[in-house]
């Protein structure tokens, strides 16, 4: 099943590339949890499609121009860690942010049930028990 989970997460990135970062009901559980790390401006979880949509809108508001480029997918059974290149420009800024981040997707019954992000890709690997 874990290979299918990686493919599911890849389809989610394809949807985000096409339609923008946000809720994708076909690939996400209605009770999805979006988790900001403790060092985030607004730490903690957001729940459901509405919570995910609010968190995604906050990202779009700060970084109206952004691109997520998955660099590597790590299979961890019912979890998938992703090393991602984020290229973004903040509101009113001419400075481009170009950094690698780590994301973790928890999958159950063919849907993403939890999404968590980390400033450092190694944090995501550690979170799923795969230290690089």
Predicted feature locations:
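C-terminal and inter-domain tail/linker signature
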Residues: 1-132
């Amino acid at each position: 099943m874990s290979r299918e989970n990686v493919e599911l997460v890849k389809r989610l990135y394809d949807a985000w590339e096409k339609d923008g970062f946000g809720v994708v009901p076909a690939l996400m559980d209605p009770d999805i949890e979006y988790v900001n790390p403790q060092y985030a401006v607004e730490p903690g979880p957001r729940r459901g499609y509405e919570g995910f949509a609010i968190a995604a809108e906050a990202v779009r508001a700060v970084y109206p121009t952004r691109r997520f480029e998955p660099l590597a997918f790590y299979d961890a059974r019912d979890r998938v860690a992703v090393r991602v290149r984020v290229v973004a420009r903040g509101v009113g800024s001419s400075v481009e942010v170009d950094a690698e981040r780590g994301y973790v997707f928890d999958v159950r019954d063919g849907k993403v049930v939890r999404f968590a992000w980390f400033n450092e890709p190694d944090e995501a690997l550690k979170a799923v028990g795969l230290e690089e």
